[in-house]
Design a protein with these regions (language model features):
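Outer-membrane beta-barrel porins/channels
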Residues: 1-179
Length: 179
């Protein structure tokens, strides 16, 4: 399942050479059981805690707001240059990190650089570089006491602490042909 996502944006031509854009986006992870339900559901009695069901466990992610700003510089008829920034808090509460080891989306700040080359009216090449800055989340694998039945000999409550860290870099090259 994919969470509901919606947003609003505005773009302004500041000058003949500069455009500015701002976007706000909302991602509703809580609408998707496998993503929004807390991991504590796994420990429910009578087998009610199956993954992805109404009473099942999930990643425990919070809904999130994403804020984006961007600037485009129109150098000439053939070249445009873009710069963008994106911020969003990590959707993971510190007591819900166990399942998030499968999808450690903890990055919060992203910077994007791009260039578009238009050698003709119908051909366009775009290059982009995205850097998601390093971020680290740490906390309990789950809330205290929830997994005592599974880990009776542990001195801590359950499997212990979890630390997630992520940094990302990506490069994109696209070609467009306009008919």
């Amino acid at each position: 399942d994919t969470p509901e996502t919606f947003g609003l944006g505005i773009a302004v031509n500041l000058t003949k050479k500069f455009d500015f854009a701002f976007d706000w986006q909302r991602v509703n992870y809580s609408d998707i059981k496998a993503i929004g339900l807390p991991i504590e559901q796994l420990a429910l009695p009578n087998g009610e805690g199956f993954l992805g069901e109404d009473q099942g466990a999930g990643f425990g992610w919070n809904d999130r707001n994403v804020y984006k700003v961007g600037v485009k510089y129109k150098h000439d008829q053939k070249w445009d240059f873009q710069l963008g920034y994106n911020y969003s808090e990590s959707p993971m509460p510190n007591d819900q990190l166990l399942f998030s080891t499968l999808a450690p989306a903890v990055t919060e700040h992203h910077l994007t650089l791009g260039a578009t080359y238009k050698p003709s009216q119908s051909v366009e090449w775009t290059f982009a570089y995205v850097h998601a800055f390093n971020n680290r989340e740490s906390g309990l694998a789950q809330s205290a006491g929830q997994f005592d039945q599974f880990f009776p000999n542990e001195t801590a409550d359950g499997p212990g602490d979890v630390e997630l860290e992520m940094v990302q870099d990506s490069i994109e090259l696209t070609f467009a042909y306009k008919l």
